[in-house]
A protein has these predicted regions:
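Glycoside hydrolase catalytic-domain context in secreted enzymes
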Residues: 1-580, 586-598, 602, 625-632
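Short beta-strand elements
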Residues: 604-620
Length: 632
């Protein structure tokens, strides 16, 4: 098994809630996306492309809602993940998006590929087009013209088959491409091959050892990732379903109905471009297929039955399907296989009958209803764009009928992006956003429902309460957007936390490198749990150049009931800075008064302190430091 290049990670700063590829991203915040993307690259590459697998930063620049951003937002937020993956993690491959920036498609955009990427950031890696992106360049009639536009614009490799770049010799002969431009592309590719060891006398291409996949340790990692990513949005006290105080009492929940299209489904467990999802996606037109070679995907029904506490009875009825006629629109542009798929498939087939009458009858006999709803890999992903952000099909109407039984409804929402559920959410006893939780996702959701673990994740997006098709982001204002139901950074727990004793310098020189921040977090409840404390920075005057509020750090803290931990975070002075372009592109750290904020979300700030930056304005081409560091 081996490989020298992975077309990941996708670090688009996704500020449009309806974006069909949001599931692949790290959300709407540039800082968070940069932290996660940089860690991804370091882990994948292992510090040496000859030993690790090369990462590819994509989709450069502004795919997912940032392509129309002004220069300041583009350079401070949208560029940031690509910048840190290149400068801090050594990412040596980059993929431009299909979209346009300032009117020019990214794959042929010299401003972003040559001026910003190479000249400003110093990138010396390889630029590869997204699949067929060069084919789709508008206003150009021939492959020769498209190849000329792309290579002059800064693109090195024509993916997937080089159909346009085969004409580059003709372009050179006709003087349409300068020799130095052609040599740049060739050198970029050769340089990558050398770094990956492909030019060595005996290149290391793959391991000859037996590779064991899907091991016990890997399943545990998958479980940990899932359990730390599931967000509790609402809870009136019904969760956890099993409470220590209620055991052996009349209050103990005994009969649970599990229902909904995602209750017993593999389609909503793994997101787009994960191997199981892609296998099922392309094999689904067959009546039968062999998936015995795939990792076992734990569905919610299986997990709830396998781990149910003594005395609890699980009943199951699907009750509702995603949709009869498939809602997804497949665009003819992009991956041509998806267009072919539209011709082959007209329905998301669950292979299981949905009997609403049966489910509603079971609901009336149950103590609690768990409704597993949302999207699936057929309804969200690249080239799959459905109408609206409400629950697909008649799922909302079905939940209304479940609510009408008078029994408490726990809504578990699966999918790669937020769904507009504001009409029903507040009337549900609890709401869980499970996303695409992976192969151990069913186990993680079940353990949270039963109270074996406490939910701890926070939202990486602003969760909308209405259909939103334009960019929204928490850092546009300190006030919560009226279109947002739950804010960025929000997430409930089965316990409560108190924040206290913030200690930070009150005055700091612009020439200083860093200072430490201290604060304490206490678990004031009765359940062991994790809290994700968040550090934000805000200006105190309207003429300051930084965002009204901006995430600048976070720390996951595990606490037993009654336990207090002191957190120390190193905060770099570069984090007070802002971008400007006054003849030269530069990073500025200006004197002034700023407000440091510690909170449980972007709208739940628990501690504040003003910090005065003194001294002269510091100007540098690029930041020396990007991220705060958790010391303890």
């Amino acid at each position: 098994m081996g490989g020298v290049l992975s077309l990941s990670p996708m670090v688009d700063v996704c500020r449009t809630p309806s974006f069909n590829r949001l599931e692949e991203s790290y959300g709407e915040d540039g800082y968070l996306s940069a932290v996660m993307g940089t860690a991804f690259v370091k882990g994948l590459q292992q510090g040496d492309l000859k030993k690790g697998v090369g990462a590819c930063s994509k989709h450069y620049l502004g795919y997912g809602g940032g392509g129309d951003a002004d220069e300041k937002e583009m350079m401070e937020d949208i560029l940031l993940p690509h910048e840190t993956m290149i400068r801090l993690a050594g990412c040596k491959a980059l993929m431009p998006g299909y979209h346009a920036v300032h009117g020019t498609k990214c794959v042929a955009n010299s401003e972003i590929l040559n001026d910003i990427l190479r000249d400003y950031l110093g990138f010396d890696g390889m630029v590869v087009s997204d699949y067929t992106a060069i084919d789709q360049l508008p206003g150009l009639d021939t492959p020769l013209q498209k190849a000329v536009a792309a290579i002059n614009g800064g693109n090195d490799v024509d993916f997937p088959r080089g159909e346009n770049y085969q004409y580059l010799q003709e372009a050179l002969d006709k003087g349409l491409v300068k020799k130095e431009v052609f040599e740049r592309a060739v050198k970029d590719v050769l340089r990558y091959k050398i770094r990956a060891g492909l030019m060595d006398k005996n290149p290391y291409l793959y391991s000859t050892e037996d590779v064991k996949l899907d091991t016990k340790e890997e399943r545990q990692t998958a479980y940990d990732i899932a359990s730390q990513s599931i967000v509790l949005l609402e809870n009136n006290g019904v969760l956890p379903l099993v409470k220590e105080a209620d055991v052996n009492s009349a209050k103990q929940v005994k009969n649970i109905l599990l229902t909904g299209p995602n209750a017993n489904s593999i389609w909503a467990m793994c997101g787009d471009y994960s191997f199981p999802s892609m296998f099922y996606f392309w094999q689904s037109w067959k009546k039968k297929w062999d998936d015995s070679h795939l990792p076992h995907i734990v569905k919610l029904l299986e997990a709830m039955q396998a781990s149910k506490p003594e005395g609890i009875n699980i009943k199951y009825s699907r009750g509702c399907d995603w949709t009869e006629e498939i809602e997804t629109k497949f665009e003819e542009s992009g991956d041509k296989r998806a267009w072919e798929y539209q011709l082959l498939h007209r329905k998301v087939d669950s292979g299981e009958k949905a009997d609403k009458a049966e489910a509603l009858a079971m609901a009336k006999e149950s103590d609690v209803i768990v409704a597993a709803v949302g999207e699936n890999v057929m309804l969200c992903g690249e080239n799959r764009e459905r109408d609206g952000l409400k629950l697909p099909g008649k799922q909302e109407e079905y939940v209304e009928e479940l609510l009408a039984t008078g029994k408490p409804v726990v809504l578990v929402v699966f999918g790669g992006r937020a769904q507009v559920i504001s009409k029903i959410a507040k009337r549900c006893a609890a709401v869980i956003q499970a996303w695409y939780p992976g192969e151990e996702g069913g186990t993680a959701v079940a353990d949270i429902l039963y109270g074996k673990i406490s939910p701890s994740a926070k939202l990486s997006v602003s969760y909308p309460n209405t259909e939103v098709y334009e960019p929204i982001c928490y850092n546009y204002s300190t006030r919560q957007d009226a279109r947002v139901e739950w804010p960025f950074g929000y997430g409930l727990s089965y316990t409560t936390f108190a924040y206290k004793n913030l200690q930070a310098v009150k005055e700091l020189s612009t020439a200083s490198e860093s200072s430490n921040i201290y604060f304490e977090v206490t678990n004031t409840g009765k359940v062991r749990a994790d809290e994700i404390a968040q550090v934000y920075l805000s200006p105190t005057q309207s003429n300051q150049q930084i965002h009204p509020i901006q995430l600048q750090g976070f720390a996951r803290i595990s606490l037993n009931p009654g336990e207090t931990k002191r957190v120390c975070i190193k905060f770099y002075t570069d984090q007070f800075g802002y971008y400007s372009h006054q003849g030269n592109r530069q990073w500025n750290i200006a004197p002034g008064t700023y407000e440091l904020k510690i909170g449980a979300s972007s709208q739940d700030i628990r501690l504040k302190q003003q910090i005065v930056l003194t001294g002269d304005k510091v100007v540098k081409p690029l930041r020396d430091h990007y991220f705060s560091e958790v010391i303890r």
